[in-house]
Amino acid sequence: MKQYFITDQGKVRPHNEDAGGLFKNKADQTLSIVADGMGGHQAGDVASEMVKTYFANVWEATERIATPEEAEAWLKSHILKANTNVFQHAEQNPECRGMGTTVIVVIFMADQLSIAHIGDSRCYRYREDDLTQITDDHSLVNELVRSGQLSKQDAEYHPRKNVLMKALGTNPLVEPDVFSVAWQEGDRLIICSDGLTNKLTDQELKDYLATNESLRDIAKEMVNEANDRGGEDNITLALAEHSEAEEGDATC
């Protein structure tokens, strides 16, 4: 499998509240994570970094996961533990009150992906010239779209586009979306924060993923394009490709 991770502060924010990375367990299986933090007094970067570090540590101590069912159970259990950690930290530290983070976590197996997510960081799968968003945003505008009160086109420019219905760490309990999908030779996957998807359309993401360029080059071009269009937010993404080759690891 080829894989690449990149995070960028963007051109406007004073610091990077995104976090993420690619990590291996004891059986050399890969976990990918992206978290987009929120909260005043720089607490957003505390929340996202806490979640990233938690998943990195527990995954690196984990033995082989053999089935999607096992992966989903692992993900749900650790999302709940990470939520408790962030919520309690915010309760105990006044400067962190109200902090939280989106999170999307992917476990890669030979022919399956198991995914857990909360918030509006997204996962897309590119397969045979088709790009599919395989996560649902936990956002106000997405709820309005789903209920027929707003068109998908109008949602892109809605003034409350960034209002989340669900985030990790803002409440004592949280219910993540957890599911598995097929992962086959030639597939490409992207998980990303909204600093990317607020600047690049789904069609543009598809066009990038359809090229024969390396994942490193694709990722850097995406980040550069998002910054060229204003770069008002932090930009974070992890790319993966189902292939025999190995490529890259991570960059900041």
Locations of the language-model features?
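PP2C/PPM-type serine/threonine phosphatase catalytic domain
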Residues: M1-C252
